[in-house]
Amino acid sequence: MADTPNASGEPGELYLDAAATESVSPAVIEAMTPFLTEAYANPASVHQPGKTAARALDAARASFAAALGARPDDVIFTSGGTESDNLAIKGIAMARMRKLGLRPVCGFAEADGEQPANCRPRIIISAIEHPAVAQSAAWLHEWFGFEVVRIPVDAQAHLDLDALERELDGEASERTTMVSTMLANNEVGTVEPVEELVRIAHAHGVPIHVDAVQAAGQIPIRFRDWDVDALSVSGHKFGTPKGLGALLVRGRTPIEPVLSGGGQERGLRSGTQNVAGAVALAIGLNESNARMQAQYRELVASRDMLIDAVRRVAPRADLTGDPERRLPGHASFIFPGVTGEALLVDLDARGIAASSGSACAIGRHEIPATLLAMGLEPS
């Protein structure tokens, strides 16, 4: 929780929307500023200022990787979670399609317009993915004929592991390019059993991408220990400016670039590298991890106190997501008979900033797809 600015720029009373974005940490601003004002050279340049920038980039990459249980060469710096998810989904799926010998849009030119099932590439995602994942999968379907399989979730937003097993059994696994799933849901806070998901995917020889955008800085991330193939994070969720993120990719994982250009970031993300941004990511994540370790129990206690208080004031309110296996600072509710918009307007008038779903869907006046996937009826 933090102060929120009102329309005049003065602090309001209470900011309860950190799941959408955090404030930029003062330590992050202090650390990155010299690379905006003094050591601003292109890290690819051969002169001394360029070498200074390159050393700072390497140090930031190593620090950032360690904070995620990864190696420096796993890290591909990007512009945020959306780009990281796009690179993972499109890059891995296309590379795997070619590796498996599958043909894109094969059969679409035939008279019946249908694609033979035995050559159609597949991608498996969950029913509650962020639009950056879901729409990337839809793009693969629209342009290359991919079959998009959505794994259902239960009433607490946990993936149906048996359904995932069934979708990977038999010949279907030979056409499955990848699996992609959230680590923690941004709308209801449920944390998925990532190690079990990795075990299932790898048992069938299929790589798995994990969207950890909502989880990084809130719960420990152990990229290498989990044996994940690719993992996305976004800096503005843990105290950096917006527009910063990363995709972790194991060297064994087939992946193709989405952007063409100078071949920076292992040839997977062309564009002049943002040294100040890399420094911000390293400082922000390490600071968030330290705070998480020091204040985890306090944060959980505050969350549970809020949940209890809401239930006392509104006995009909339903907590969404898993009541136990959830992010430590996340609480979301359904209030029967009250629209989210009306509630938020009232809270805002009282100086309380909150959200009624993913910030990426604000203004659409639709029932959140996550709640529908959990089996909740529109009301």
Which ranges hold each PLM region?
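Pyridoxal 5′-phosphate
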Residues: 1-379
